[in-house]
Amino acid sequence: MSATNPTRDDFAALLEESFAKTDLAEGYVAKGIVTAIEKDVAIVDVGLKVEGRVPLKEFGAKAKDGTLKVGDEVEVYVERIENALGEAVLSREKARREESWQRLEVKFEAGERVEGIIFNQVKGGFTVDLDGAVAFLPRSQVDIRPIRDVTPLMHNPQPFEILKMDKRRGNIVVSRRTVLEESRAEQRSEIVQNLEEGQVVEGVVKNITDYGAFVDLGGIDGLLHVTDMAWRRVNHPSEILNIGQQVKVQIIRINQETHRISLGMKQLESDPWDGIGAKYPVGKKISGTVTNITDYGAFVELEPGIEGLIHISEMSWTKKNVHPGKILSTSQEVDVVVLEVDPTKRRISLGLKQTLENPWQAFAHSHPAGTEVEGEVKNKTEFGLFIGLDGDVDGMVHLSDLDWNRPGEQVIEEFNKGDVVRAVVLDVDVDKERISLGIKQLGRDAVGEAAASGELRKNAVVSAEVIGVNDGGIEVRLVNHEDVTAFIRRADLSRDRDEQRPERFSVGQTVDARVTNFSKKDRKIQLSIKALEIAEEKEAVAQFGSSDSGASLGDILGAALKNRQNNE
């Protein structure tokens, strides 16, 4: 057979040899012989009854440079054995795709990477040419981080990983991101192996967040947390760092599993907390600058890297429920006193009010117990009155200290907020910041004096003047203590029931009665004429009569009365 001028018999021999082993059917790739080349198509015989026409452009470079010749053996895809024009429908392009599919399936099963070219942008991603087969590249799989402009990546051969293949639907999904992540992981692993905790390295600030900065250590990033940037308070990393800035850092921790690296800058400097207890002893007065104000207090910088907290309770002696921002402001210079130092927890407790005179102590010094004071009623509660006093302090009058004789719940209704009242200082507790006042102490405690004299002890006999008469009994006033009054009930007016008539008593009349009860708590005095008469009767019987004397009760009482008159 001549290579330059093949005969028809030669073509027949080649075809028989080519198709002897082939059982042709639609939808498969078959080998054929180029029998002729016309203007823009190649005539291909695949051993069917009819030949097929294949566009030259589907042969790619061979068609362009003229290397495709009559007699060449080619692979084409048989779409239809014969169409309406009596020709076989063949496709070199689909044959190439079929070849690619078969090759890609092998690599997909083996987990191997494939090479492709991003050539077009579609909804949700891009199309990739995998040497004849078209795959879909989702936008999320282009890179490790989102990329706005993909133009530099297009039309350049790159490695991809096949995520999914569906031949029935003709779908292939690939990822460039997984390839980058694997490469990056390998690179990170190699870099991490060469790093050690405590090692000092240089890097470039790559990104800044609210909680820290990411530093590129040459192929792997480390996190420099805001708390490890300086010993002093750093409110935001941007205060001391800029993107692109070269920094020297120390490796604090390395997680070999996750390849996460924690970095520190302050660790390169000496720890200002070393020896802090000796430098700031408890009780020392120092100056500082307010750096931050919160709901619970204010932070004060004593020196770079050393801050202390003034708790809200240590800000003012008298302003208890005021936000710290109403007392202090950031950047303000303040004098404070060291209250507590905890080097382990790196905490210093400071006091602002301790730099000022304690108003409770000052009040106690100038107002000892028994001192009379004057102030305005600031509040009225269920347990007493709060009185505003000198020095911006308050004192409390308890219900029990409002009046000697009347219930406090009744007396407190006579006072209103804003009233100016006088009171007596009863006690000052500097530690608890409490001042106890009394209003009733401004007057005499007549009942207390009477009780102290012994006249109100149980069974004591007292003389009283009638000052009032009603159906229930009589109201009397003690003769020896005119400010002390009591009430004798009808049933206690006489042992004789017929004599228990209040109307037989008159105002100004003096009567004797026996104390049957006295309550110090509610200050109530119970008197009884009846009890006195019964007691006197028993005493007379015991003194002037006996069981065998034969004397009548009248004789005994008469003798007792006569004896009493003689004694008087």
Swiss-Prot record:
Pfam families documented for this protein: S1
GO molecular function: mRNA binding; structural constituent of ribosome
Family affiliation: Belongs to the bacterial ribosomal protein bS1 family.
CDD domains xrefs: S1_RPS1_repeat_ec1_hs1, S1_RPS1_repeat_ec2_hs2, S1_RPS1_repeat_ec3, S1_RPS1_repeat_ec6
Task performed by this protein: Binds mRNA; thus facilitating recognition of the initiation point. It is needed to translate mRNA with a short Shine-Dalgarno (SD) purine-rich sequence.
Domain S1 motif: 27-93, 111-177, 198-266, 283-353, 370-440, 459-530
Coiled coil: none
One GO term describing the cellular component: cytosolic small ribosomal subunit
GO biological process: translation
Protein name per UniProt: Small ribosomal subunit protein bS1
SUPFAM superfamilies (alphabetical): Nucleic acid-binding proteins (SSF50249)
InterPro entries registered for this protein in UniProt: NA-bd_OB-fold (IPR012340), Ribos_protein_bS1-like (IPR050437), Ribosomal_bS1 (IPR000110), Ribosomal_protein_S1-like (IPR035104), S1_domain (IPR003029)
Alphabetical keyword list: Repeat, Ribonucleoprotein, Ribosomal protein, RNA-binding
